[in-house]
Every structure is written in C-alpha cells, then in structure tokens.
A protein has these predicted regions:
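Catalytic active-site module of serine/aspartate enzymes centered on a nucleophile-bearing elbow/loop
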Residues: 277-337
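N-terminal cap/lid segment of alpha/beta-hydrolase-fold proteins
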Residues: 1-43
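Short alpha-helix in the alpha/beta-hydrolase fold that links the catalytic acid
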Residues: 246, 259-270
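Conserved alpha/beta-hydrolase
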Residues: 63-96
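Alpha/beta-hydrolase-fold enzymes
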Residues: 132, 136-224
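Short beta-strand/loop motif that positions the catalytic acidic residue
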Residues: 244, 250-252
C-alpha cells in the first residue's frame, strides 16, 4: 500500500560513539540554522525553544521504519532523532556479518540509548528531551544512566517478552518461534538470520537470547550467561528504572499479541518514579480492522493514533475525546511538567 500521508522530509544522517567505542548511527530532523558556539561547537539557533523527541525502536526494527512518524513530529514543531541499536540497520558492523557480534538488551539501553541522550543534550542544548518508545524501546528507557533528563515518554506496546504474557490464543506459536527456534538459530549460526525468515532484521545472538530467556522479573534474565550480572548489579539495574520521573503514557492495542495488559503492566511496575497512564485501544474504535504490534507507526494512522502521542508530548495529558480507555493510572513523583 502506498503511503499518501506525511512526507518523510530528508533528515540529516548522524553518527556517534557509545562509551565502549561502538559506533551508533541514525538520523535527525532539525529546525533552524546551526551556528558555532564556544570552542567551535555547533548548536541550534533556536535552542531551548522546542523539545527534541528520541524514538526508541522495537527489537530488530530499523530506525527507517519510524521516518514518517518522525517527520510528523517535525511538522508539528519538534526536532526528532531516530537511531539504530548496535547490530541493527545503520549501526550494523561494516563487515555486515553478525556472527560473533556482541550485543544485548542491556547494551542497547546502557550504552546506545545513553549515547543518544548525551548527543541530544549536547546538540540540542537547553531543549527538553522526550521519548517515544516502541516495544523493547520502553525497556531501553529504564536502562540509560542519564534517563532522569527525559521530560515525557510515550510507549507503544512496550514490554520485555516474558512468555507467560503472550496473547492466550497465540502463546504456543510464539513460544515455538521466539523461545525454541530463535535461540537454537542464535546458538547454531552465531546470530539470528531473521531477514531470510521474514521475521525482522538479522539479530545479534545476545539480543536474541535476552529475549528468548526473559524471566518474569527483567533483572533475573541476566542471572547467568554471557551477560550475567552480579546481585548488586541487578539491584542497580532495577534502581535505574526508578530514576525516570517523566510521566509515561503506555499505549496498547487489543490485537497486539505481545502487548497484552499483563505484559504492559509488568514493565510499568519498574517505573516507580513516574506518573503512569495505560491507554488501551481496540481497532474498531478508530474504524480499522487491525493495528497489531507494529502498525501504530504506519502513516495510515496519522489522523487517528498519532495525535494521541502528540497530545501527550505537548501537555503530558491524554487527547480529549480520543479513542481507547484507561485501564491503569497511577500518580507519580514526576518533577517534569
């Protein structure tokens, strides 16, 4: 189907380096002209006027998938950044092979997203930083050491794929694919050749195993294996989620086999410092037959779903008269407005 909605304006390619030296690449949509400040550092001429929104992708979904949504935000006055986690898309190793490439969900949050947060603070000084997070991108929000700088968060289908939370009618199929077949492929091939299977982008072994072996408690996923954490490190990991004080809107849809109510709220319980709102939407409420886990960011939903995210980014409140029903809400100790 051809997109006829928001035109994906040409963004600027960006390249940064995570704390461990891994290159992270993405794209930025900027308003205004850049100028040289102290020591020749380039800054935006409109710094401090508009927020910058970082889009955290789902597991092994390329950042280019979010171009039209980012262009939509840009058209409404926001600067925007999309990026690929290490091993994916623009941030895939230049050798192209993922065999033996080391990466996990922890790396994506503690190193990659952290690098993007620091980039936003440096390149857009004085501008509020908001985040739109898809699927595991919501987990990534809680992992970054600088996540306290985030002003507002919108999550779509955000969870960490604990198998007990999958939609009942799809649980056996999903268990077979994601928790049996995927880890076998990862171990045998050294990565998951997911593109050949039509699943998603090729996926680093460590990321695939983080998903396949995910426990009821997120931190327990890292009790053993190549990315094992000590007990003290797991305690610090949980505490990092609490550093987020941004109000969070968690959107889920009734036909998302990953983003069930238990899955969404399992993750939300980690964000103890945030005001939380869980908005659940049925496709019929917007006159559509389906939405699912991925389609929220398709431009056919520009007029029906994207304004929900936009309203939250603007005011930290739900869009008046919008679709869906609030199934969970909790006040928090938010220091952002």
């Amino acid at each position: 189907m051809q997109d006829t909605k928001t035109t994906a304006l040409e963004p600027e390619a960006i390249a940064l380096v995570a704390a461990d030296g891994c290159p992270i690449r993405g794209f930025a949509w900027r308003h205004g002209e850049r100028h040289a400040g102290d020591c020749g550092v380039m800054h935006e001429s409109n710094a401090g006027v508009r927020p910058v929104v970082i889009v955290n992708a789902a597991t092994s979904v390329r950042c280019r998938y979010y171009f039209r949504f980012a262009a939509f935000l840009f058209s409404h006055g926001y600067d925007a950044i999309v990026y690929d986690y290490r091993g994916i898309g623009e941030s895939r190793p230049r050798s192209r092979s993922l065999r033996g490439f080391s990466a996990s969900w922890l790396d994506w949050g503690q190193l990659d997203f952290e690098a993007v947060l620091q980039y936003a603070a440096r390149e857009f000084p004085g501008q509020p930083v908001d985040v739109v997070a898809h699927s595991v991108g919501g987990v990534v929000v809680g992992l970054a050491p600088s996540n306290e700088m985030i002003r507002r968060v919108v999550m779509m289908g955000a969870q960490y794929a604990h198998w007990r939370d999958y939609a009942p009618g799809r649980k056996l199929v999903m268990l077979w694919r994601w928790h049996v077949l995927m880890p076998v492929l990862a171990i045998l091939a050294g990565y998951v050749p997911a593109r050949r299977l039509g699943w998603m982008e090729d996926t680093p072994k460590g990321v695939a195993l983080s998903w396949s072996y995910s426990k009821a408690r997120f931190e327990d996923t890292f009790r053993r294996g190549a990315f094992a954490l000590s007990e003290a490190e797991r305690v610090r990991l949980v505490a990092q989620f609490s550093a987020v004080h941004a109000p969070i809107l968690a959107i889920s849809v009734t036909d998302d086999e990953f983003g069930t109510v238990p899955a969404i709220e399992r993750l939300l319980r980690y964000f103890t410092g945030s005001a939380l709102t869980h908005l659940r939407i049925a496709p019929r409420q917007i006159g559509q037959p389906a939405i699912g886990h991925f389609a929220f960011f398709h431009s056919r939903f520009e007029d029906s779903l994207w304004p929900i995210a936009l309203a939250w980014l603007k005011s930290g409140a739900l869009r008046e008269g919008g679709p869906g029903s609030v199934v969970f809400q909790r006040a928090g100790s938010s220091t952002h407005c």
